[in-house]
Amino acid sequence: MRTYKHMTVNDAIPKLDSIETQHTDLESGDPMADILLTYLNGRDIARLKMTDAEIIAAVEQALVAQGNGQTVIEPRVHLMPDPAFNGHFNVLRGYVAPLGLAGVKVVGDFVDNYKLGLPSEMAMLNLFDPRTGMPVAVIDATFITDARTGALTAIGAKHLARRDSKVLGHIGARGTSYWNVRLLDSLYDFDEIRVHSRRPESRNAFAARLERDLGKKIVVTEDWESCVRGADIVVEASRLERPAPMLKTEWIKPGAFVVPYGTMSAVELSLTDIMTRMVVDDWGQCKGGMFGSLRAHVEAGKLSEQTLYGELGEIAAGRKPGRQSDDETNLFWHRGLSLSDIALGHALLEKAAECGLGQKLVYA
């Protein structure tokens, strides 16, 4: 039996009262009662109206579990059906012992979907009872993917950015970008928010949505430098077709907090040279794979086990300190954690049960 710090797997798994399954002896030949799972579609999730605080709390719970050695993460895998489709699938897998759930998420990332009026990232999350392998839930994970990504960015800032940060520069207007800005602003109440993306119609629509929901003016910039230079917090969530050093290291002011997580690298190799602390969500995922904003830095040895300060879960769990002074210039690179998907999926299931939302489907 795998043993976790201070607990065994059986100790760690809470009783899953919400799983409506009835097991019988399959070898006896007696009829087996229906095995049910919960299905939450996008409309159900929208009706739940998860608050910013609920989203951040759910994701931080998974980070703390990770930092305490109570999780299992399998490195993500990719499927590229055809280069002509300009997209790929990511498959994320994990287990969160304190929640008693294992999960597998499949998310499609198709850059040209905007031409069809579709989101670029659409996902499904499957949750399972880790003791039996039985399915617990199937959830539309498009919201989960967007919101948990923003929560990771915000939690990274909570531990690694200056507390008096007042200017945010955000590159990119994809689905996750909205939640980056919204959840960061929920923690910092910025005086100035700047946004930029490649397509004018995209960045203008992004700014309009933020102004409506945050109730403050958003500055739309015409170029990367105007967005980034002098900002206290910089988030790079671009969608480049191939690596290109669009974000210049000289634009980053001392004491800033930088979050690069675009699929393709958009930063200079010298970016890591100015950093006090470099933190990732999961080193196992970051050190390999086809994609990632700091892939070239890993391959060049600029980001390694020796130069890495730690994983965000270690900081969230109190095992390592976060920012220690205003002079630090810190970086957080996240590839996306299956643990965050599972934790937010769990929070949605709990709230859906309280609100009477979702459908019970017969699995077997």
Q: What would you call each of these model-derived segments?
A:
Residues 8-146, 154, 164, 310, ...:
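N-terminal ligand-binding/catalytic initiation module
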Residues 19, 215-302:
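Rossmann-like adenosine-cofactor binding region
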Residues 44-49, 269-364:
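Adenosine-phosphate binding glycine-rich loop
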Residues 153, 164-185, 197-202:
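Glycine-rich adenosine-cofactor-binding loop
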Residues 164-166, 191, 329:
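Nucleotide donor/acceptor-binding cores
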Residues 187-210:
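NAD(P)-binding Rossmann-fold cofactor-contacting core
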